Amino acid sequence: MNARPLSELVDDGWAAALAPVESQVAQMGEFLRAELAAGHRYLPAGPNILRAFTFPLEKVRVLIVGQDPYPTPGHAVGLSFSVAPDVRPLPRSLDNIFKEYRADLGHPAPSNGDLTPWCEQGVMLLNRVLTVRPGTPASHRGKGWEAVTECAIRALVARRQPMVAVLWGRDASTLKPMLEDTAVIESPHPSPLSASRGFFGSKPFSRANELLAQRGAEPVDWRLP
């Protein structure tokens, strides 16, 4: 991750919103360079670390919070839960998300795991921690990314625009106080360990659209190719 100004890396709105933590982003770049110097790799690839912030801040209407990137090489792309179009098989959490997508909306199974079309409609796919050591989940938790992503969430709330936050799992649910009066959909995480405890049947996609409509906002077209 190069030491470049945020204005060269992210959407202009996000560059302004993240200005209070720009020095923290730079420190995380130093942390990642130290990881490489020590013989450790990190995911996702440098250009994708801040990818969630390349979509316009002012257009965000749904926030889906993940924990940290997929630790499997080739999976993490900088958007929570998403993978590149050529990834097979899908990560099991994403496979469960697609099972609920089909059950909730009645759409056919997507042809691949790329969730970029959601981002293009104002769905922000944000991990609380933006990097991970390959093969070691949560390895970069507590290293400093949380200050950056919490600043981002506060910026979303401060807009006072209609937004729905989708919080999957206990880790994501700890953000609820920060969301103030934002509409929130909570359920267990879609991972195989917890999906059957309330993620399946939670209808997050249709419920998000209902909550957006109640607030006078356009619904999301969740259909994926």
UniProtKB/Swiss-Prot annotation:
Matching SMART domains: UDG, UreE_C
Catalytic activity of the protein: Hydrolyzes single-stranded DNA or mismatched double-stranded DNA and polynucleotides, releasing free uracil
Organism: Mycolicibacterium gilvum (strain PYR-GCK)
Name of the molecule in the record: Uracil-DNA glycosylase
Role: Excises uracil residues from the DNA which can arise as a result of misincorporation of dUMP residues by DNA polymerase or due to deamination of cytosine.
Keywords: Cytoplasm, DNA damage, DNA repair, Hydrolase
EC number: 3.2.2.27
UniProt keyword rRNA processing present: no
GO biological process: base-excision repair, AP site formation via deaminated base removal
Family: Belongs to the uracil-DNA glycosylase (UDG) superfamily. UNG family.
Subcellular location: Cytoplasm
A Pfam family of this chain: UDG
